Every structure is written in C-alpha cells, then in structure tokens.
C-alpha cells in the first residue's frame, strides 16, 4: 500500500505482492506487455528482469531510438537483435514466417522509446491479431499518448511506473485506474496517491488475463 502516514490512501484496496506474470499457455499464442513510466522510474530494470525470466527462448528484436543508451548495455541476448529505429517490416516478417510454419517460432518485439509509432498498422496488428500467430510484444513508453486506444485496450499485462507529469498521470488514471479509486476523490488527490504509490521504483501491475491488480517492486 502507499505510505501509511496518510490514512486516506488506505481506502484503495491494492495489495503489495511479489512480481510475477502468470503467462498464458504458449499454445494459445503470444502475450502483450505495456510499461508506462518516466525516465529512471524502473522500466529498464523491469524489462531486463522480464526478458531474463520469461522470454529466454524467444527470437526477436529490441527497437529503440536510444539503443546506445546505458540502459541497454547489459541487455545482450543471443536471439534478440538490437535496432536503432522502429522497423515495422520486421514485425510483418515474423508474422509471415509463423504463418508458413504453423507458429513454430516464439517471436518477441520490444518497442522502447519510439515515440512516433502511435499510428503504425503493424503495431496495431501486433497487439491484436498477431498474438494468435505466436507473436509477443513489450511496449515501453513515457506516456499513454504514444499508444493508440485500440492497442491499449488489448494489452494483457499493464505495468504503471512513476510519472513526473501530472497530465500523464491523470490520463493514466482515467484509462486504467478509475474503477479502483474512491469516487469522492478529486484528481489532485488521485494524482497525489499515484505519485506516492509508484515512488521508490514501485509500480502497479494490472493482469487483464486474470482480472487482478497489485503493487510490486523488483529488487535485483
């Protein structure tokens, strides 16, 4: 829970739990993960942990316009290439390969720090119909405006990290958290709660496959 010094925050029934993704059976297709948070909020640490824990056997590409940044220096995986820009044709190729091989390959596309992908058709397909062809995705962004509403509504796992922009926090609450917060709270109180809840590299994990929400922190 958020800091105990504000008893009002205790009205929000979101428990602290160890981080764990209850991944769907690979036979049913791929999965999708969305991480939303500001720089240095813990997204890169979480991304590396998820890759190490859940995607060791996947083949794919890490797309980032900041691919030379320190955050990616330790993300070296034999089956995951690094690309300094977003290349939608590669995602389409993954789909085509699995279409011709009966979903033989566990493909993964990681899209991090690519602010211009919002209207891309391959990203839309990746988070919707391509999952049925064994394609998984991880999208990392600094605000929800970088992802269109259809993509957002089809994400399996949503991870909400600290945001330093009140407008971004308000939009995040409206999209993902409105049903979890007391109706009597105004947005100043909701924003205050969000900042406190996601401080010190904590984040909220929404599991849309199992209908759960919890607060987590990855300690490495």
Regions found by a protein language model. Name each.
Residues 1-22:
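N-terminal pre-Walker A segment at the start of P-loop NTPase domains
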Residues 58-59, 106, 157, 200-203:
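Short, surface-exposed beta-edge/turn micro-motifs
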Residues 56-64:
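Conserved catalytic segments around the Walker B and adjacent sensor/switch elements
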Residues 21, 30-53, 65-69, 78-183:
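Conserved P-loop NTPase motor cores
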Residues 26-27:
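Conserved hydrophobic segment flanking the Walker A/P-loop of ABC-type ATPase nucleotide-binding domains
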């Amino acid at each position: 829970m958020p800091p105990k010094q504000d008893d009002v925050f205790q009205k929000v029934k979101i428990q602290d739990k160890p981080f764990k993704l209850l991944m769907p059976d690979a036979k049913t297709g791929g999965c999708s993960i969305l991480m939303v948070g500001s720089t240095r909020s813990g997204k890169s640490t979480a991304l590396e942990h998820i890759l190490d824990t859940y995607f060791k056997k996947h083949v794919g590409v890490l797309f980032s316009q900041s691919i030379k940044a320190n955050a990616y220096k330790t993300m070296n995986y034999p089956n995951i290439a690094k690309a300094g820009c977003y290349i939608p044709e590669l995602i389409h190729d993954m789909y085509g390969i699995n279409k011709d091989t009966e979903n033989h390959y566990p493909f993964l596309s990681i899209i991090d720090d690519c602010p211009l992908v919002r209207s891309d058709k391959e990203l839309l397909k990746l988070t919707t119909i391509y999952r049925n062809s064994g394609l998984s995705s991880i999208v990392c962004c600094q605000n929800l405006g970088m992802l269109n509403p259809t993509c957002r509504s089809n994400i399996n796992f949503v991870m909400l990290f600290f945001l330093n922009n009140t407008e971004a926090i308000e939009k995040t609450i409206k999209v993902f958290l409105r049903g979890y917060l007391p109706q009597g709270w105004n947005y100043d109180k909701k924003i205050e709660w969000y900042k406190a809840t996601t401080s010190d590299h904590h984040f909220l994990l929404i599991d849309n496959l199992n209908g759960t929400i919890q607060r987590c922190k990855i300690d490495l």
